[in-house]
Amino acid sequence: MGTTPTIVKSRRSTSVHWMRWLVVVLLLLTAGWFAWVYRQIVATSNIDNAQPADAIAVFGAAEYAGRPSPVLHARLDKVVSLYDEGMAPVVVTLGGGSDKDSGKTEAGVGRDYLLANGVPFDRIIAETKSLDTEEQVNSLANIEERKNFHHIIVVSDGTHLFRIALLCKRAGLNVYTSPRAPLGRIDDIDAAERMMHEMLSYTALRMDLRASGIRLWLEGRSSKS
């Protein structure tokens, strides 16, 4: 006995009904996830957890012809302040991205800036090979093991620190996050883009996305701060 058109139509209607509910549930879960990530990023960016440690590590940002960009400048000023307060005896500058005109690296420019602002040469470790946040964390973990550090203050943009904290935890690092000072009024579109970048980057990290194109974009190798 064949299936009647009415029964077939009923089954299709039921399938469509459940598909719609599935889509709604997935959208709600996705919205909930990104709302949680957003809140965590904001919370981390608004709290300075700096306390006495073995070292201060500053994550790299763009440099122009051997001079720190405004973002890197602000990060380095934060490091100088922490060092002058006696928070740690050693500073680690991270970042191997180099300027093709000057040949300088982010870490090298950071070291030069710190030297010019009173941090002794023998108190600075410049890591000049890493190209993205994850590589910088891995390099920092190697330095931590080699130097027998136990606690490290990590300095970067406030919105960057939530992801850094997760990467450091995975690398076995005990860190205190410390955001740089704001640069002033940021364009709403630029601020939204930065937040979206970090939300997607954190999500990709939690999902262990390793597709090269996605990873390069999310890690910001193709653009400078």
Describe each PLM feature range.
Residues 222-225:
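Extracytoplasmic/luminal low-complexity segments enriched in Pro/Gly and acidic/polar residues
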Residues 5-47:
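N-terminal type II signal-anchor transmembrane helix
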Residues 13-19, 51, 120, 206, ...:
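Serine/threonine-rich low-complexity intrinsically disordered regions
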Residues 2-7, 36-195:
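A structural signal for short, hydrophobic/glycine-enriched beta-strand patches
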Residues 188-218:
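A transmembrane-helix-recognition feature enriched in membrane-embedded lipid enzymes
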